[in-house]
């Protein structure tokens, strides 16, 4: 089902089952396709990953004092990008099968991967606070009714001075919801909520921005047409700082 301009909820259990099946398709030859899709286009996955990191990394200020919370870490794609010596990295994902892969791929002693639902994230951190939060492609799977609560919970884990990096697929025009929509590309039913840029900024205004953050930068991630191969959606990023 494709719903354009309408609000509808998606099923978390179906999304979790989708990613469980994605984990079964993990291929060391094309590891990032598990969460970036494009199973048959390794070159596109590689180039999108390279370009995303090239654009976003300079905004993150990663160094020895960095304490990173990677929300929806998947198999640890962004953990791979962090080559500096840092203080702490916590990667969380609601799919335990993806977390298992992340733990096998990354053995650095101060990098930790956990499986937990987003509504439990604050209590799972054992009092840890973070100065960098990565939210890469997660809001698209969160229903409206839970979104503000999730964002406020993540804000509560931020240090006084912190950066939040949000990279999301968003609707180029009006909201698009895919609900149990069969994808020929993925060979599976898919659920996602592609919000407009204005909707996301509205969610930030009542959460992060209300707690002292400001939007330091926001724009479309890819300018290249071959990296934007969707007509109704595109990748967009927001850099929030406090």
Language model: regions and residue ranges:
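Class I (Rossmann-like) S-adenosyl-L-methionine-dependent methyltransferase catalytic domain
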Residues: 1-64, 71, 75-125, 142-149, ...
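A conserved beta-strand element that flanks and buttresses the S-adenosyl-L-methionine
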Residues: 134
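Short catalytic micro-motifs in class I SAM-dependent methyltransferases
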Residues: 137-141
